Amino acid sequence: MKKLLLLALSVIFVVNADAQWSEAERAAGYVVFERDDLLALKRTDVPGRDAVVSKVTSTLARDEYESVQLGVLAIGGGLEQVKATVESDLAVQIYHRIDPALKSRLGDVAVFGDQGVIYNWVPANVHLQRGDLVGTISAGDNVSLWLTIHAPADAEPGLHSGKIRIEPAGKPATVLDLEINVRPFRLQRPRAAFGMWMREDMMPEWLGGRSMPQETLLAVYQDMADHGHNSNWFYPMGRYDQLPPVKCHSLERLIPLAQQAGLVDPKIPVLMAGGVPGDRKGRAVYEAIAWFEAETRRRGLPEFIVFGPDEPHYPGDADVVHRALSPLRGTSLRTNLDQSNMAGVYGYMTPGLCDVHTIHDGSVTPEVLAEAERMGSSIWAYSYRVWRENFDPLPQRYFAGLYTWTYKLGGNWVWAYNFGHHRHAWFMPDSHEPMPITGMEGRREGIDDYRYLQMLEDCVAAYPDHAESANVTAWLDSLRNRLVGAMPNKVTAGAPLAPAEFDQIREKAAEYIGKFGAIADASDRWPRSTHTKEEAAYRGRPVQDCIAGLKASDVASRRAAAWALYEYGPDAAPAALALGKVLADPDVRMPALHALEKIGPDAAPAVPEIAKLVHHPDPYVRIGAALVLGEIGAPVQEYTRTGRRKASPHAALVVEPLIVSLKDEFEINSHTAASILGSIGAPAKPAVPIAIGYLDRHHELSAAGLGILTDLGPHAAAAVPKLLAFGKGDLADTRVVEALAAIGPAAAAAIPALTARASSQTGAAQAAAVYALFCIRNEPGDLQRLVDSLLGPDADKREIVERLQQLGARAKTVVAQIRPLLQSEDFSDVHEGLQTFLGHVEAGEVPGVFYEW
């Protein structure tokens, strides 16, 4: 519970009407003020008069940490050697904003490498440096002092009084009263898995990678545990081609240290990757799993969940995902997928495939949760961006705590403990001592928010007839309804909660807990380990039986019938109309969408019913509808990340609803619709004005707009003026050059700018401009220039060969110059690409340029 700060009540004489500081404060040369610990304190921030404090109070439960953020503002002149001390019978760790000279020194990538560097664009106020002495505060600047209080499990409840003393060299000291109230209960352990990804080889090089001292690794794990985490990602695991496995780095080294640090909880699952029992084949898979589970039971370890392909695209990575996870289907090991966008959430939530879906922040929705419950799947959340939003701790606290609680998630993870600018800890040069960022401290606050609300819900469950149970239930329901739909990376001070409301919620929860009486961990409320259901009751039965099953009286049968039709794929085409009719049934809707998607173009009779769902209030349902429409109008030809769609005879049917999806407020849905529309060709021309408008929007939408215009090619001719304006004259964005090339002769207005770029640039940029010129004006000289560049001494060979591949048969006149290169060692690194080009020429193919979605 954050401190309540009492303002100084003394009457202050102000020198003049415009000055806010008293003569005494000016004489001292500084003031000490409070800043909410959910908000970043920038070096140049100047506090208001009402922020100056004389007393700091903080309230926390036993075995809880709580932070206080103070600021010291230099007024008049600068300050030197500012010393902070705390007198308290409770432990208080003092941090200050990272020293500017140290921050500047750590900005040298050449010296400290990608994992040790602190990039210059990351603000200093993010990094907390352990220590009680600040060297210098320039006149008009401030420094933040971050005090982290810890009440041990055996702390005496009640008031603990102390002092905070701030004293710059040669200046009078400022002494603040410190009052810490310890609540008479200890919070329960969280029942959700709170973790972050950490790999030894992603830490600063001076720590030693996988050879770092055990003391260092133990300190890292202890830091995670002290910040509220109870789970971890273990990598690498080992090799299971013999039992017991050899070189099992995680079992032999990492896990014992994590146990020693108190990071892992036997009841909370952890993740494993990089050599798992499922890597073997056939019967050996079961033998390896049996050995592994016996070993983890013997050692009292938690459940290990297999970490599947990371952030897979859908549908492009479908084959990769199924190859990776299918060997574990039907085994006792659960599997996990990190889903970076809503398309993947829809695409990989199918029977028996994945048990734990860890979904990127903001993509968890009520319909996702409802479908996961029907399937027996678990939903967790993760983020790699939330701490960077304004660099305030507030989004971190919200994401870890209230977001996890609102959606009743099984886990909450962040990338990463330390990885480039995705870090939650940092290290001083040559030091092995981790130090936190403010977001890490905020994350711990969020985990504690979750623990308070979890404990209160347990009180109601234990005492349903208590006089306060109805009031508590109503309050919790109201709070949850208020928070549903808030995007974690978009939360700000005041939306959906003001900073003060976080502590008001916690205070109210604690007050209610006091009325019930604190209860210990509720053993019957720990989450059960469940696998995603197979829902196979109709598997293999005739299509007509499955169609009849769609009308069964029980939900399980209707769902099983739809999933059986999904497994039939195109052979289930006779069921298209029947599947369309059940899309109105929320319990069967998602299996029916999957079945229609697998049927493909022959599901066209269901388009009117599918089209209704692009207006659904939940983006999970909307993305499913858009992807099904895509398979009907422009089915995927190859399940790879570069796999293309090809328009079907039914393409025109899906354009209108996909344009609705293109306007979807959920940006990944808009992006997905754009990628489909671009494949449809002329019928999708009505999307061009929207795509043109998107060029003026932020990155995600401008990328979608460029994608449509590129893939529609000549059908997007109306976009040429806007593309030239978007390219800002010099066409430095290669994506714009490619869009103009795809449009072709209708982009003649771009010739002067492209000519200038081809003359002023070298390498890939020059090749793109020359390629575009040839596409637009079809002059042999442009093609020859491309070939001459390839033969030149400084050629970007891969780029030029890729451009020749895109031209295919249009470049047949240079085949005689290209073919001898296959015999040249100087071109051995592009022989495969040259063969591909010649193959296109022989087949009469002109692949063209496609947008990299």
Predicted regions and their residues:
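Structural detector for internal amphipathic alpha-helices that build alpha-solenoid repeat scaffolds
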Residues: 529-538, 556-571, 589-602, 612, ...
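Catalytic-core region of carbohydrate-active enzymes that cleave or remodel glycosidic bonds
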Residues: 351, 355-421
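Contiguous beta-strand segments within globular domains
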Residues: 53-76
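Surface-exposed binding patches on compact interaction domains or structured appendages
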Residues: 20-52, 76-147
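An acidic-aromatic substrate-binding cleft motif
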Residues: 174-275, 302-305
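Catalytic domains of carbohydrate-active enzymes that cleave complex glycans
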Residues: 277, 289-318, 326-343, 421-536
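Amphipathic alpha-helical scaffolding segments comprising HEAT/armadillo-like alpha-solenoid repeats
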Residues: 537-549, 570-583, 602-614, 635-661, ...
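Extended acidic/polar, glycine-enriched regions
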Residues: 73-82, 134-190
